[in-house]
Regions:
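Short acidic, S/G/P-rich loop/turn micro-motifs used as interaction or catalytic elements
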Residues: 17-25, 51-55, 75
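Alpha4 helix (beta4-alpha4-beta5 surface) of REC/receiver domains from two-component response regulators
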Residues: 26-27, 51-67
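Conserved phosphotransfer microenvironments
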Residues: 1-41
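CheY-like receiver
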Residues: 87-144
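C-terminal output helix
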Residues: 73-82
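Flexible loop/N-cap segments at domain edges
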Residues: 57, 77, 143-145
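Hydrophobic/aromatic residues positioned on beta-strands within the core alpha/beta folds
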Residues: 47-49
Length: 145
């Protein structure tokens, strides 16, 4: 679905232009997360927004982007944000209907905590240039009452 017959790259980024409409973004993320390759399914998907509001950012986090970068932003800041996807652990959530970064990561302390509606897996992933994408831990979590 993503146009990759044979895929040998260890570390891939998907950089998404701000002109993608919502349906195109949903399709891209669905196809990416269900690509059948760990290198693709857990590749960082980074959306560039033009002067996005906090609501725009939250909406796109909920869609499943790993990061949202507002442009214009200087090149050094963009490089720092992209580098943050490499060499550190990231929490991904896997449910029957979603695979992607933890959508609760922007919840603020004191904010009403959302509850898991179904059993899901928490996957800790690590991306490095040397090893590509690795699933470091997988923990099944029951739904909260």
């Amino acid at each position: 679905a993503l146009g990759h017959e044979r895929f040998d790259h260890r570390l891939v980024f998907y950089l998404v232009h701000f002109d993608f409409d919502t349906e195109a973004k949903k399709k891209l993320l669905h196809d990416l997360r269900h690509a059948g390759s760990v290198s693709l399914s857990f590749a960082p998907a980074v959306l560039f927004l033009r002067d996005g509001t906090p609501e725009d950012i939250q909406f796109n986090v909920e869609l499943g982007f790993d990061d949202i970068i507002n442009v214009p932003l200087d090149g050094r800041a963009i490089a720092t944000r992209l580098a943050a996807q490499i060499g550190r652990e990231h929490l991904y959530i896997e449910t029957r209907h979603y695979l992607g970064p933890d959508r609760h990561r922007l919840d603020t302390p004191g904010q009403t905590q959302r509850k898991a509606l179904e059993e899901h897996a928490q996957l800790t992933i690590l991306r490095t240039p040397e090893a590509g994408v690795q699933i470091v831990r997988r923990q099944v979590v029951g739904k909260k009452q």
